[in-house]
């Protein structure tokens, strides 16, 4: 029997490379569909953030007409409870998101700032309406030109006043950002092992400063 050796020609049209197809291992595909492949730390963060974004407890702080639109989102027509944010709290210590709906006056600014400081971590702020975003049409001495001058804001909802759908979209944007945050853990796990950092509460850390204060600030100061 005679054998003929033919040199491979990559430019030949017998089996061009662009038409070649690869077949995945069926066992590997089945494992990837049914087994979670990843680090335990990422799984913990994603699970905690999923629970956080679906259990936002807002602190209702309405200062103007935007609060009427905010209250409308709680009705059956818009049903804010679909997003887990219908549990309105009357105390900042039980809330984790502040919705500033309306005009922020200079007299009200210290109150907003004090209530924000009383909220527990993690906490977020939604600025609802043109007045809360930038002062709106009230460019006068008695109106703060944007609530972000006194507290940090995570989401701005435009409008005068914004429709309930706009507030719901802003809430969804906040939920999307929460899923990407890193959860502050009391116990850390890394390559060196498991350790628990000494995290002093903010209240205890500033206790000496509070005791040392002799001249309290006036209620109308920022």
From Swiss-Prot:
SUPFAM superfamilies, A to Z: HydA/Nqo6-like (SSF56770)
Broad enzyme group: translocase
Cofactor(s) for this UniProt protein: [4Fe-4S] cluster
GO MF annotation, one: NADH dehydrogenase (ubiquinone) activity
Residues covered by region (Disordered): 198-222
Main location group: membrane
GO biological process, one term: electron transport coupled proton transport
Stored Gene3D superfamilies: 3.40.50.12280
Lineage top rank: taxon: Bacteria
Cofactor binding notes: Binds 1 [4Fe-4S] cluster.
NCBIfam families per record: nuoB_fam (TIGR01957), PRK06411.1 (NF005012)
Function: NDH-1 shuttles electrons from NADH, via FMN and iron-sulfur (Fe-S) centers, to quinones in the respiratory chain. The immediate electron acceptor for the enzyme in this species is believed to be ubiquinone. Couples the redox reaction to proton translocation (for every two electrons transferred, four hydrogen ions are translocated across the cytoplasmic membrane), and thus conserves the redox energy in a proton gradient.
PANTHER family in alphabetical order: NADH DEHYDROGENASE, NADH DEHYDROGENASE [UBIQUINONE] IRON-SULFUR PROTEIN 7, MITOCHONDRIAL
Family: Belongs to the complex I 20 kDa subunit family.
Designated name of the protein: NADH-quinone oxidoreductase subunit B
Organism encoding this protein: Psychrobacter cryohalolentis (strain ATCC BAA-1226 / DSM 17306 / VKM B-2378 / K5)
Highest classification ranks of the organism: Bacteria, Pseudomonadati, Pseudomonadota, Gammaproteobacteria, Moraxellales
């Amino acid at each position: 029997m005679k054998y003929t050796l033919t040199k491979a020609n990559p430019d030949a049209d017998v089996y061009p490379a662009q038409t070649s197809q690869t077949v995945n291992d069926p066992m590997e595909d089945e494992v990837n569909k049914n087994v979670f492949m990843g680090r335990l730390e990422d799984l913990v963060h994603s699970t905690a953030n999923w629970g956080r974004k679906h259990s936002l407890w807002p602190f209702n702080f309405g200062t103007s007409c935007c609060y009427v639109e905010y209250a409308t989102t709680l009705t059956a027509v818009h049903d804010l409870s679909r997003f887990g944010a219908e549990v309105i709290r009357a105390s900042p210590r039980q809330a984790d998101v502040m919705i500033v709906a309306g005009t922020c006056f200079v007299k009200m600014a210290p109150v907003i700032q004090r209530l924000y400081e009383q909220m527990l971590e993690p906490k977020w702020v939604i600025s609802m309406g043109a007045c809360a975003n930038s002062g709106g049409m009230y460019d006068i001495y008695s109106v703060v030109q944007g609530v972000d001058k006194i507290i940090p804001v995570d989401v701005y909802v435009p409008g005068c006043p914004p429709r309930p759908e706009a507030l719901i979209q802003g809430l969804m944007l906040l939920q999307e950002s929460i899923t990407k945050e890193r959860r502050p853990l009391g116990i850390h796990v890394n390559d060196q092992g498991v350790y628990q950092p000494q995290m002093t509460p903010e209240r205890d850390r500033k206790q000496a400063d509070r005791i040392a204060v002799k001249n309290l600030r006036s209620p109308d100061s920022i």
